[in-house]
Amino acid sequence: MSRISICELAEWQAADRMFTLLDVRRTSVRLADATEIPGAHWRDPEEVFTWKDQVPRDRPVILYCAKGHEISQGIAATLEAMGLDARYLIDGFSGWHSAGQPTRSLSR
């Protein structure tokens, strides 16, 4: 299964590389954090089978959850099995935030 580091994702963002960034944190965790990685689109991890076919296939998709473990890795594996270039963010949102990378307030 493919993964991407915090530094690599920051480089991709700085280079304006084309990719889809999906926040797949559980609703309660996401709302408690009240922030997200800029450019991310939230998808409910509990509903993956209702939205998986809507993920663009023409570019890499990067997924992040709270810590970069079960949720993002499981969904990345599902998308990869469908033929998508799917990667999970190592250390997830907590690693991104701890590294001092930019975040934005959740859109209301």
Question: PLM features: what roles do these ranges have?
Answer:
Residues 1-20, 24-62, 67-108:
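Rhodanese-like catalytic fold shared by cysteine-dependent sulfurtransferases
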